[in-house]
Amino acid sequence: YAISKHHGNLESFEEYIEKLARNNEENILKDLKNISVSNNGILRDEILYKLIKNEDINTYFNFMDVYISIRKEHISSQESIAIFTLTKMMFSLLIASDYYSTSEFMQEIKYENFGNMGNIDIIKREYENSEIIKSIRNIEKNGISNEKDINNFRTKIFLEAEKNLEKNKNSNIFFLEAPTGSGKSNTALNLSLKLLNENRRKIFYVYPFNTLVEQNMNTLKNIFANNEKVIENIAVVNSVTALTTKDSRDIPIEKYSNILMDRQFLNYPFIVTTHVGIFNTLIGNTKEDCMPFYQLANSVIVFDEIQAYKNTIWREIISILNSYAKLLNIKIIIMSATLPDLSYLLDHEEKNNIARLIENRDEYFNNEIFKNRVEVNYDLLSKKKIEYTKLLEHIIENSLNSKKILIEFICKNSAKEFYELVKDSEELNINHEILILTGEDNKARRNSIIKKINNKDKKVILISTQLIEAGVDIDVDIGYKNISGLDNEEQFLGRINRSCKKNGTAYFFYLTDAKKVYKNNIIIENNLNLFSDEMKDVLKNKNFDIFYSKVLEILKRKEKEKSSEDNFETIIYNKKFRLLKEKMKLIEEQEDKKTYFFNRTLTDEEIEEIGTNIDGYEIWKKYVNILKEENYAKKIVELSKIREKMMYFLYELKKDVELNYSDIKGDIKVDIKGSIIYIDDGDKYFTDGVYNGGKGDMFI
């Protein structure tokens, strides 16, 4: 089956068997001959002919049907996932062998290494010699003198997690639950490096958003003091990062193939990536998805903010991770400040592979450093939608004694409407700089805003969408938020008084119904929100087990309601690879979107962040020329480089948004990204770097 698919995608093994059974003797012989030809005659035609001639095909397949039916009744779920994994592994190794052998032949070279091309040992060594670890080891040696100091408290969490990792080193999955601001990133880095050994030589760091990828790459750079020897061994793998930073003039044409293959097969010792990327590898069915699958074996994978993944497939996620960990010698760390106990969704015997690294999470969550960091206030919350004017008056009153104020809306249009109101308020704009941050903002603008709000001397009011909940490292005095799900509210509280050096306050209000924004979300659909006194109590006491037990119970009930043909076990048993990928989509594709390239003038703040000005039209021309490149590897590598610069000009709009199409200079079909429409006079759609055209929501 794997051989027959190596020029295509894994689809359904069940359909493959049925297709074979329907074919006549001549077609089967033809298929087998094709296999022989594609494998350089490894299977000789005369042997195949005798095999077919002396065998009654119908009898053979009737026997196979009976055998499969009987086998299905006796095979365990563990055997099913093992066969599923083996099939995917064989397919991945076959593709890799094919690609490497072809590349060796075409380039007349010999590959000696088919895995990590970097040096993981230098990362381990430099980490142990870093200032932060020296400080932690010093505290470990001399004891923690003052637990009210937040850094000492972080050290306590760090050391407890390290101790429990050693105690449970035979487990495959580790849960790390600790409060926001407690140093989880550094703790997880230490744990992942501890899990490396002679056979386990690769680390994956997985985040739900590109903003988190960027933020944590910066954290790693800070930990390693921008040591180039370390940083060059850490690769960011996502849709917005170039495959190489080298100028095309410095890359020999034959090197493009190596750069592309390193990315396709993830030939790096330490990878920082997104959940979409890693799950394409974990459960994807296309050739491109499966290329690096074999690299997951003998690795360490760290998942951050897993509660942000689509909760309707939590059960499938933990089942896949648990099985792969056992079968492929993977160690998995799952961490969050709001961590659901996903082991509840597993069978009893499967839970034995999971260990908690913090034994008594209440000791930390209920400590006054974290628990009382933010006072929650419900004066503005009622089931009647709040008026903008009432919200504005409340903010004006609080602005007198607050330097940093954050207001989060869950609808981008609401954020933009309120931003205009705040900008026009003399009471607010006379003392505070008014800023807005949404999902449509590019990296340069986002970083500029973060710097402003983290500047101790600046007074700032930031209006934002829910992207602020994770992946944006800011610290404010007061926060206002449109309610949604309880897990979202806790993530929002993590943006307030992060330093724990002052008193912070959060005000919740109701304006937009979360059900209109969050589709197919168990938490939102079941009203697990702050209208409930029970949920208010959970948020106050940080007892998220009560909250998540309700969510997990709903998921378990829904799983029982699924038909036998539709459930996870049946899909795995029948090896329906394509169907599994469809059912485990982390992000639903929005087909009502169009991508536009606005040729606009970058703001001074954007230019400062980028380090140079970028001419949109010149970037567009380079992009069009790259699309004409005939060398495939060079084309893909150069596209990844130009795409980094295009991100400052690319925006997604709903198809029904009306723009002045007389500004369009070209409409070009892109093989990978679909249609991109070029708008030449882009400046008229922007004010101070903020898109102001149309009502269509682009992102969140």
Q: PLM ranges: what are they?
A:
Residues 1-126:
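Accessory nucleic-acid engagement/destabilization modules that flank
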Residues 170-192:
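Walker A/P-loop
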Residues 201-224, 238-241:
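Conserved Walker A/P-loop ATP-binding site and its immediately adjacent core
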Residues 227-283:
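Inter-Walker segment of RecA-like/P-loop motor cores
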Residues 236-247, 410-413, 434-447, 465-469:
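Conserved helicase motor
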Residues 289-323:
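SF2 helicase catalytic motif II
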Residues 325, 393-402, 408, 413-432, ...:
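C-terminal helicase lobe and adjacent C-terminal extensions/tails of nucleic-acid helicase motors
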